[in-house]
Amino acid sequence: MRTLWILAVLLVGVEGSLVQFETMIMKLAKRSGFFWYSFYGCYCGWGGHGLPQDPTDRCCFVHDCCYGKVTNCNPKTATYSYTEENDGIVCGGDDPCKKQVCECDRVAAMCFRDNKDTYDGDKYWKLPPQKCQEDPEPC
């Protein structure tokens, strides 16, 4: 019960595109981004250091790089417009910054979908920080 309460408190603080990103991951990869990717590898979750450990972790690395290139809005809180069409996501709206955030999230969600078979939770879930000490590659 305590775990559910803590999870509820954490989710209350999440807003904007992070909730939308979770929805995209659910739509495209058919799994929860929060539960599957929040503590995976060196780049999935908050922050990111070292080298991506596998193709799934690379999805998170590329997503972090994409967010780093966003200007004129906060990518973690900006709410954007998108539609679900067939089996995909189409980003819309007139705000270039919000559209860029949407594209970052869309590409990452597709990457998770396309790399589901590389996910190795036994090896990379809650990876110790000392495993992520290499010099990072440039975005």
UniProtKB/Swiss-Prot annotation:
Cofactor comment: Binds 1 Ca(2+) ion per subunit.
Molecular function as annotated in GO: calcium ion binding; calcium-dependent phospholipase A2 activity; phospholipid binding; toxin activity
Primary location group: secreted
GO cellular component: extracellular region
Catalytic residue positions: 63, 105
SS bond list: 42-132, 44-60, 59-111, 65-139, 66-104, 73-97, 91-102
Protein origin, superkingdom: Eukaryota
The protein's enzyme class: hydrolase
Coiled-coil segments on the chain, per record: none
UniProt note on tissues of expression: Expressed by the venom gland.
Keywords: Calcium, Disulfide bond, Hemostasis impairing toxin, Hydrolase, Lipid degradation, Lipid metabolism, Metal-binding, Platelet aggregation inhibiting toxin, Secreted, Signal, Toxin
Documented EC number(s): 3.1.1.4
Cofactors: Ca(2+)
The reaction(s) this protein catalyses: a 1,2-diacyl-sn-glycero-3-phosphocholine + H2O = a 1-acyl-sn-glycero-3-phosphocholine + a fatty acid + H(+)
Binding site for Ca(2+): 43, 45, 47, 64
SUPFAM superfamilies: Phospholipase A2, PLA2 (SSF48619)
Signal peptide range in chain numbering: 1-16
Biological process (GO), any one: negative regulation of T cell proliferation
Record's subcellular location: Secreted
Assembly with partners or alone: Homodimer.
Family: Belongs to the phospholipase A2 family. Group II subfamily. D49 sub-subfamily.
PANTHER family, sorted: PHOSPHOLIPASE A2 FAMILY MEMBER, PHOSPHOLIPASE A2, MEMBRANE ASSOCIATED
Name this protein carries in UniProt: Acidic phospholipase A2 S1E6-c
